[in-house]
Amino acid sequence: MKVGIIMKNSMVEKIMELNRKIESITMKTTSYFSFGEKQNLNNYDRQIIEYYQEILNLIIEIAKREEIKNVEIIDNKYFEVVNTASMMIEEYLSILQFYGNIDRNITKREIDVINQIQENLKLDDDLEIKNKIELADCYFKTGNENKARKLILEFIKNSPDEDEAYMCMQNWYMYDRPDINKLAEVIDLAEENKHILITDFGYDRLVKFYDSVGDIKNREKYQKFYDNWKKKRETIEF
C-alpha cells in the first residue's frame, strides 16, 4: 500500500514538474500565449503540446491505479487548488482547439485526446458537454461530416436544450461549409424541440435567402419562426 502511495505521489510530482516547464515556455513567444495575428506552430508550441500529453497520460495512470474515473476525486486527493488535474486537462483541450485553427493535424490529435479522456476519465458536467460538442466539430473540420452529424444529432436527442450543439451545427452550414438546406434543418430541429436559440443568425439568413430567390413559401415559413423567436426571446434570460 505504501509503495502504491509513493508511486502516485511521484507521478503527481512529475505532473507538477511538467506544468512548471510549460509555464517556463510560455514566457517565450508561442502562438497560443502571444497576442496579435496567429502564427505557424513553432517548436515551443509543439513542446507545450507534448508536455500536456504527458500530463494527461500521468493523470490517467493515477486514475487507473486508484480505480476511479472522476477527476474531481483525484483533484481533492492529490492536487492543490491552484493547479488541479481538471484545470490542466481543460487548458490542454483549449490549446488543442486553438492550434487546430492553425494546423488541421492538431485537430486530428484533439479527436484522439477527447476520445482518450472519454474512455478513461469523468470530468465535470460542463466540460463533458463541451467535449462532446467539440468532438463532433473536430470530425466536421477534418472532413468526416457523417460522423460529426451522427455525434451532434445524438447529443441533441439526449440534450435537446443545449444551445451550443445547435450553434455548432449552425456554424457548419453558415460559415465552414455553407449549405442553406442543412441550415434549414438545424432551425427546423430547434423548432421541433421547442428550443429557443440564443442568436437569430440562422433565422435571419434563411429569411433573406428565400426572399432573394423568390421562394415565398419558405420565406413565410421561416419569417413566422423568426417572429415567434423574437417574442419568446424577449421573455427569457440567458
Question: Model features per residue range: what roles?
Answer:
Residues 1-6:
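Short, Lys/Arg-enriched N-terminal segments with co-localized hydrophobic residues
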Residues 9-39, 43, 53, 76-101, ...:
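Amphipathic alpha-helical repeat scaffolds of TPR domains
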Residues 44-55, 104-118, 145-155, 179-193, ...:
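Alpha-helical repeat scaffolds
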Residues 59-83:
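Acidic, Ser/Thr- and Gly/Pro-rich intrinsically disordered linkers and low-complexity segments
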Residues 77-85, 123, 157, 194, ...:
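Structural signature of alpha-solenoid helical repeat scaffolds
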Residues 99, 104, 142, 175-177, ...:
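Structural motif corresponding to the intra-repeat A-B loop/turn of tetratricopeptide repeats
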Residues 126, 160, 195-197, 231:
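Short coil turns that delineate tetratricopeptide repeat
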Residues 202-205, 209-238:
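Terminal, low-structured helical/coil segments at or just beyond the last alpha-helical repeat
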